[in-house]
Amino acid sequence: MKTLYSLRRFYHVETLFNGTLALAGRDQETTGFAWWAGNARLINLSGKLLGAHVAHAGLIVFWAGAMNLFEVAHFVPEKPMYEQGLILLPHLATLGWGVGPGGEVIDTFPYFVSGVLHLISSAVLGFGGIYHALLGPETLEESFPFFGYVWKDRNKMTTILGIHLILLGIGAFLLVFKALYFGGVYDTWAPGGGDVRKITNLTLSPSVIFGYLLKSPFGGEGWIVSVDDLEDIIGGHVWLGSICIFGGIWHILTKPFAWARRALVWSGEAYLSYSLGALSVFGFIACCFVWFNNTAYPSEFYGPTGPEASQAQAFTFLVRDQRLGANVGSAQGPTGLGKYLMRSPTGEVIFGGETMRFWDLRAPWLEPLRGPNGLDLSRLKKDIQPWQERRSAEYMTHAPLGSLNSVGGVATEINAVNYVSPRSWLATSHFVLGFFLFVGHLWHAGRARAAAAGFEKGIDRDLEPVLFMTPLN
């Protein structure tokens, strides 16, 4: 079989350049990579690489199913989800499964079904992974040319990219169909304190959807993280799904333009670096989304956001002191600013004290008390409902903060519950993983560019300890 590899060099890096695809073994002699380099041994063995990826998918889905069932087994319906260390059930609840008004869990059976379906799926994937890793063909190019590929074949690579985009688009539309036709999703903004509802009136206006992308990422604007109604979220998924599917069809039908052929590095390691870079961006965006957004991640399931807990504390003490006779409209705090209420630089009435930094918080329990110019003093005096007091006291004592210092006052809250919020878990894990993926992106991009330029020498392996050890087998 004619290969597309240059004969420029013979170093053990990135892709083999020794002009052969006949790599029978998966050992260091034939591949240039030792056993611990994992899938690097399989760079030119498309069948075995398929097995590794399918088996990896099986492990991922097995974790999802097992962890799902573990959370179901430990779940106490009387306690809020966020007090129980759950990270999967809140996602299922947000999709509208098993919950009723106010986010109360009324049926855990859908959660059980989800766990079992994932376990069964993981068994299928696990079998497929073992089959392709051990029994299937080493390479797919000869027997299944549709699934075969050569890393330098630009046209085939963009076809594979197109297939991936179409699958992502279908995934986006699955959420749309769930929201529109299959029972709806949980809306924290539903009147009366949140409920599952079908989304009927989608936002499809491009000026609204793409307007989010043009917003500043800073306070008061918040880029796409500022989305606060489900019509926009589901409408955004219609746009995103459509773009992914049409983009996928485009990439399948076309060949890369000349500028793209010149600008990009076309090797397996380069594609790995591009993917890691994209995943890194996704991780950082997800971190901000779960930390700040209480619409896509309802506080009923994930606990309050940091700003929400801080504003809830200010609200709780405003209610208390107002009952004790304080005039919350004019009371001065220790700094000379308003103790309970003050004005933002743009003139809105906002909560005073340390929580002033979170003046742009929007939350379902607080919005009914706002007027055209921020918080409405007459509503604060006459219209506060018991459910708002209960909700804010609950959120005040469940700040997602651990024991940081400058946190809008709530770290000193003596009634706080000692727990770790799922928001903290999800935000920190996605930030850390996003950072590691970024480092991996830089590493593999550097290696891929050097290999393409022809000056990558690799690590000098003459004195490598592993070469002096007896073989594992």
From Swiss-Prot:
GO biological process: photosynthetic electron transport in photosystem II
Phosphothreonine, modified sites: 15
PTM sites of type N-acetylthreonine: 15
TM spans (from-to): 69-93, 134-155, 178-200, 255-275, 291-312, 447-471
Propiece residues: 1-14
Record-linked InterPro entries: PS_antenna-like, PS_II_antenna-like_sf, PSII_PsbC, PSII_PsbC_sf
Family: Belongs to the PsbB/PsbC family. PsbC subfamily.
Protein name per the record: Photosystem II CP43 reaction center protein
Gene source species: Carica papaya
